Amino acid sequence: MDVDDDAIDIMLENARSLGVEGKVVPMCEEITNVGNIEADLVLCNPPWGKQKHGADSKFIKSIKNLCLPTYLLHSSSARHVEAEFLRSGWQVQKLLTLPFDLGAVYPHHTRRRMSTDATLWRLTPPWLSAPDRS
């Protein structure tokens, strides 16, 4: 799911090269406009909110409402991601941290390119991470 048609095209090209195109359903849509969907997994790279505090909050809320396993790429300096999901009973795993190159795409970007650290989180909803009590 993405609001950028070019990103959807790249995702489809990558899925084809990996031989999984039949398992990927692209959606060109804002995550906040999506109700219940049938999916195995959500991949999310929201605005990080460095320029505008809370820019990611609607994405975090939508992920929690979808209640599906999610991989979330977010700024490594964001401390609220882990706490927000743990507070809601989700299982949270920090998978890796890596440099993330950014081109100047927004008016507030003053440099042509920069790099920042990003963390990839695996977020598992409570219904999947609850212990078996049978």
Can you say where each PLM-predicted feature lies in the sequence?
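Class I S-adenosyl-L-methionine-dependent methyltransferase catalytic core
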Residues: 1-134
